[in-house]
C-alpha cells in the first residue's frame, strides 16, 4: 500500500544514490562495451551449463561458488567488476557482487541479467559463435 510517504526527499535521494552506486543496467553495460573501453570487467556468475547456452561476448566466466577460490587469480583488483547472472528472478549476481566486495573488489550488479541482455536483442556468444537474438517486442529502449 502506498499511503505511508514517510521517507523525506533527502532520505529518498540518499537511498537511490546508494542503489546507483552498486547497480547498472543492460543498456549502460552494452554502451560501455560498445565504446571499446568500458572501464570494467563483466563477470558471468552462472554455472557452466548456463555459460555454454549463451553469455555476453567478452564476459569472464567465474561461477559464484568459485569466487572465493579463484577471484584473485582471474581478476585484477584495480579494475572494477560488473556481475550478472540469469535475470531478475535470480540473486546470483547479487551474491557474486557481495563475495567480490568482501574480498576487496569494486563491484556493481547488472540488473536484468543475461535474460534482459538477450531479450533486448544484444549479442550472445555460444560455442557456435556470436549471434543477436530477435528482440522481445515487450522490450524497447526506454530512452532514459
In which residue ranges do the predicted regions lie?
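Short, flexible helix/strand-to-coil boundary loops that buttress conserved ligand/catalytic motifs
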Residues: 55, 71, 121
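Short secondary-structure capping/turn micro-motifs that flank functional sites
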Residues: 68, 116-117, 133-134
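Short, hinge-like loop/turn segments at secondary-structure boundaries
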Residues: 60, 78, 124-128
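Short loop/helix-cap segments at secondary-structure boundaries that form the rim of catalytic
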Residues: 51-57, 117
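Flexible, polar/low-complexity N-terminal or interdomain linker segments that lie immediately upstream
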Residues: 1-53, 126-144
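Short active-site oxyanion
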Residues: 36-42, 57-58, 80, 106
